[in-house]
Amino acid sequence: MPTWGARPASPDRFAVSAEAENKVREQQPHVERIFSVGVSVLPKDCPDNPHIWLQLEGPKENASRAKEYLKGLCSPELQDEIHYPPKLHCIFLGAQGFFLDCLAWSTSAHLVPRAPGSLMISGLTEAFVMAQSRVEELAERLSWDFTPGPSSGASQCTGVLRDFSALLQSPGDAHREALLQLPLAVQEELLSLVQEASSGQGPGALASWEGRSSALLGAQCQGVRAPPSDGRESLDTGSMGPGDCRGARGDTYAVEKEGGKQGGPREMDWGWKELPGEEAWEREVALRPQSVGGGARESAPLKGKALGKEEIALGGGGFCVHREPPGAHGSCHRAAQSRGASLLQRLHNGNASPPRVPSPPPAPEPPWHCGDRGDCGDRGDVGDRGDKQQGMARGRGPQWKRGARGGNLVTGTQRFKEALQDPFTLCLANVPGQPDLRHIVIDGSNVAMVHGLQHYFSSRGIAIAVQYFWDRGHRDITVFVPQWRFSKDAKVRESHFLQKLYSLSLLSLTPSRVMDGKRISSYDDRFMVKLAEETDGIIVSNDQFRDLAEESEKWMAIIRERLLPFTFVGNLFMVPDDPLGRNGPTLDEFLKKPARTQGSSKAQHPSRGFAEHGKQQQGREEEKGSGGIRKTRETERLRRQLLEVFWGQDHKVDFILQREPYCRDINQLSEALLSLNF
């Protein structure tokens, strides 16, 4: 029995309908290729049995995804044909189905491309919804304002273009040009999809694409920044000569492992795996480039210190790697979590288990620009600054020198992942709080997306906000989060914080359900405003709730007077000391419950002191008699007109409109704005 995946696990057996046996056998090679598992249809114990037993052999995660895929294939809970812009059709047909396989790995849904702009999705409910969401995300990114694919005469290309084009080096792909013309936002999402597959143990589809290894190796070589070619830090570079490092330009590589056992399935696992320390670690990988495009050869030797004790020799087309177990270089494993330029982690020719070649795994946004792919040997003019940067970061793992003409671009995704590397523990002290503090209502989705830089749903951000108010003495805290965020979602990070807050009754889930393959969610903003009304609480959100302000005067007052904005500086949660402006109450006053003095309306609403401060009483009685308080639509109209003149001064405009509820004269309001001192 062959060994599937990186680590063998006990077989997983489950039953499906016997009517689906033909489907299973038809899709068996497809499942084995994508999920890197062995699929077996066990013999029936009784011919009349309405079920058949399937057995999966492979790593636990692979088997779990394959099991969900097969269950959805045999008994689909949802099946529908979705539509998307025809421009994206090349994603599902191009690259020999590679991106389609990655999407199947990520969602465990059965995907069948049809006419341009049409995709049939079937599977379990969760898998169907995830696949539909990923396709909708790709369609949405088509309209993002990103620079399109490579253009003629461009002297530099971004890391996204470099990595993406490296995936498309397979000859004879009719959709290659269409893929390269996709917007950068779509290419970035596809690379993120590939990263999800690589962070697990798939897709095994790579092994069936013979031409893909050259492209991926080309991405790896281009991602490695060449050190100064003085021989001080290279690893046996004397035998390199003019070794070729041009996988991204069309060279193909034959990957061989010397001294390995014969037989075994073809496999290519992208995830970085730590092998047991007892194994023999002396391995060799011979990479022999076979030029198909011709041209001058280029060399890009790997940094010796970046690979630990790995000997790299590239001479006469050979590339040998001798390695030590990762236990000797624990920092390499930590560095493998950050995204580098390479998309290939392990290469293997189908004759034995593949050796592990450490190289930086992919990330949604590569941190480097890619300069002209000139001779790697000419890149030795990198200054001392690069050496210092490498030395400072060496403790975190292997660092790669960039080319002298390339830029060093730090991305938001990279910064977010770096912030997640800092440990954080939600620690709510079991001590009494202050009884005079208001109820805190947190907009969980808004807080999580702000901390996740609008790309990830960061559960840590919610936990940090709760920790902040808990430390201030608040004990009445409610976080609202849509219920579907608790299901499997690739955008959610560190969901264990949500579980803990839910167990402490600090988190409430707004209802959501799936009907006909579409997610139906309740409007969580209503829950927040309603709870703030009933508890006289404060809403923590950067949302303006403009759509709810018109529903009632009470809600308008809550949104105007009890909305607390916030921001994050890394993992530091910050709120303003003057939530209603410089002349308004302090944060401590803002968060305290109002003093309930009988007969004093001003005591019931102390925050109105800000609205009453500095009121101009001239003409107020005339305005009251002539028209009364402005309606909401009149206020919004006046606000738009004022912002056309006082652009960017939203806070001042809102203050004047709040202070002058009877005034409808745009000129008087403008004069009042000009007379403000803050």
From Swiss-Prot:
Is the keyword Nuclease in the record?
no
Q: Which SUPFAM superfamilies match?
A: Eukaryotic type KH-domain (KH-domain type I) (SSF54791)
InterPro entries reported for this sequence: KH_dom_type_1_sf, KH_N4BP1_1st, KH_N4BP1_2nd, RNase_Zc3h12_NYN, UBA_N4BP1_C, ZC3H12/N4BP1_RNase_Reg
Quote the cellular component terms of the Gene Ontology held in the record. cytoplasmic ribonucleoprotein granule; nucleus
Residue ranges annotated as compositionally biased, kind Pro residues, are 355-367
* Residues annotated with Phosphoserine modification: S10, S359
Per UniProt, the ranges with Basic and acidic residues bias are: 370-388, 610-633
Q: Which domain of life is it from?
A: Eukaryota
Q: What is this protein called?
A: Protein KHNYN
Q: Which organism is it from?
A: Homo sapiens
Q: Gene of origin?
A: KHNYN
